[in-house]
Amino acid sequence: MEFPIMCKKNQPKAKRSVLAFYVYINYFVWGSSIILVSQFHSWFMELWHTDLKGISIVISMLGLGHLITVLLAGWFSDKFGRKNTIIIGTISNIIFLIGLLISRNIWMASICSLFLGNANSFNDSGSYPLLTEKFPEKPASMNALVKASMSLSQTILPLVIAAVHSAYIIIPAMAVMLGLLLLKVSVTNFGKNGSIVKETVSEQKEILETSTNKPSVLIDGVGMVILGFTLSFIFYMYSQYAPVFAEKVIGSTPVFSKTLISWYAISSLISVFITSTVVRKVHPFKVLLVYSIVAAAMLAVMVVHPTPTIARLTSIAIGFFAAGGIWQVGLTILSRYFPREKGRVTGYYSFAAALTYFVGPIVSTFILDDTAASLVHVFVLDVAVSVLGIIVMIILAVRCFKYKFI
């Protein structure tokens, strides 16, 4: 179902490559949007008359907005079409960007941040199904490019900020990009939603063959959803607080602190392609364990020995081993565990990730003050959550190898 105002009836369908391009541009800007507040934290503290706690509250509202709308967005996408869903996501992102500049306190900024969370929900619910439907022969690769486009934008943004400095130039430019995209999407015929793909014969056969050793919903299902939270928590908290950690704890310059996110994003971009290849040859649980242990170890090293070199190496490690596709590996395991309920379990897994974007910054507001020690404590929390994830991972891996679930 399409709203009549959005699309002309006799309009020819757009090429699928054009639709994919629209999706990637949308995520390119959204990827930059989610780190804007942390990248301009000092400037926003003056504009909104607040401190680091206030900045954390604004950041946390992204997660709350995502939590509130994530289930609604999925229903809306199936009911009213991928195009209309993406349009709502794009408009929400524009509202966020404009709102950042006109806000004069953290409460106005927090309301605007809710719209970015809404953009997250509607972009995901419209874009991922669209790519899966338009590219049925290679959905995983096309969806991986979403992460790649976000990583690319997060690589470029800190460099642009270092060169331009002014939020009054960068943020309106991002809004204009989305505005132009919105115009193109509004007059493009996306075609009808694809039908739900039925289980293949091989999937049905696999279910029958492993019927005596099925994963437990209460143990394996819940455990994987917990990993959906912990895996997201590690890289999200790092991406939000690494720049200010570098300034307050290490004593680095603002320019250096912002480049940490560039290293993180470049590494993440590289990892997207390498991890997608590795996971075809190595058991996914082995990939999860190795990646998570390396990420947790580097975080711990940075907490114990915070230096510019260690911070840069940690950015590279977190980008590659925590943000470059490991979350998607967990989702793949969960989908293979419960092939008859892929949609539902994906929703639970995504909801756990959305919880990260709210819980992490909110908890940080109770830890942060104006001292460097409080920032160290935030990263100690990140390490603790990483260790918790590894413990859950080991339990699930032992069960997987013992009962040969996959």
Stretch-by-stretch model annotation:
Residues 37-39, 217-262, 266-267:
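Extracytoplasmic gate region of multi-pass secondary transporters
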Residues 137-138, 142-191:
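Helix-loop-helix hairpin linking two adjacent transmembrane segments in secondary transporters
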Residues 69-81, 271-284, 368:
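Helix-to-loop junctions at the C-terminal end of transmembrane segments
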Residues 122-135, 324-338:
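Intracellular juxtamembrane helix-capping segments at the cytosolic ends
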Residues 283-330:
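C-terminal transmembrane helical hairpin of 12-TM major facilitator-type secondary transporters
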Residues 112-149:
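Cytoplasmic helix-loop-helix junction between adjacent transmembrane helices
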